[in-house]
Amino acid sequence: MHPIATAVVAAFAVFAPAAAQEPARTARIERIDPALDTLIAADAPIERVATGFGFTEGPLWHDGKLWFSDVVGDKLRTVDRAGKVTELLANSGGLANPPAGASIGSNGLIPDRDGSVLMAQMGARQIVRVDAAGKVTPFLSAYQGKRLNSPNDLVYAPDGALWFTDPPFGLFNGMDKDPKKELPNNPVFRYAGGKLDAVITDLKLPNGIGLSPKGDTLYIADYGQATIFAYKVARDGAVSDRRSFFTFPKGPGGGADGLKVDLRGNVWATGPGGIWIFSPAGKTLGRIHMPETAANLAFGEQGDALWITASTSIYRVPIKGVGALPMFAR
């Protein structure tokens, strides 16, 4: 989730005007290290597949289409390879009578074991299941009797545990200062065996989330610190040895928001100007400069395509078969 502009709260609320005012930027791929050549061609086309949305987020390749959220339009949609857009669910954020322009739609999406999709609802402050017909059923909404902040992004670990970030972006009356906020912090949660644990509680604005191929390294993009943090993950889900994986320089066009980890353990993350690609050791391999502010990304098709949600549009970039599809993807 990316705070572009605000008319409701400082740092996070109204997206459409800011998206319309973005300065013109040239789409291109920047090769910083020769290792990038094994991941993506320097002349790979950056294709705008669909446009005209409020602010796009939460991309997921599922059932042969890209599912995505419009956090301002408050809709869940799909788009196919040909650019055909289908509305799957209106009021995807689940909040009755939402204020105009607030970022309270749905956000992160991930396939679940039964073929449905888990969806983070910023407005209703919960995670729900959505089936192919758009039917919604509750999944997670509280921790120790207190309502979640506004779940943002999700990932399944190889052991079947669900991890997700819970920043206050959907609390549109001041985020951390919103009187409706019940949790004392902005946790990273792990759900396994029917039990929800707040594993990390000391980040400012935890946002994007990803795991290494073996599930032994957890990556969290903290928008509030412009940093991707990495943690060791034990078999029981305990985390340790936090380190700063990468701190983004200041710049226009995005921040520490969405991220994904490919089959080789490379980290693809949104940052200023577009998508940044890092080796497992944190070395910058290259960048995809985007014409709009990128909020999130997803590997799709046969692992040979990168789909990007960026402001008002959906983009696709061919890659070299390294994309890791999420667990339970089909």
Where are the predicted features?
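Short loop/turn segments immediately following beta-strands, especially the blade-tip
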Residues: 231-238, 319-326
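Short loop/turn segments immediately following the C-termini of beta-strands
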Residues: 71, 122, 167-169, 223, ...
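A short loop-to-beta-strand structural motif that recurs across blades of beta-propeller domains
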Residues: 75-77, 126-128, 186-189, 227-229, ...
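Beta-rich, blade/repeat-based domains predominating
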Residues: 50-65, 94-121, 144-162, 182-188, ...
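Blade/loop signatures of beta-propeller domains
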Residues: 21-45, 326-328
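Beta-propeller fold detector
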Residues: 47-50, 86-93, 137-141, 198-201, ...
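Flexible "stalk/tail and boundary" regions
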Residues: 45, 63-64, 79-82, 113-114, ...
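Short, conserved, GDST-rich strand-edge loop motifs in beta-rich repeat architectures
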Residues: 22, 164-183
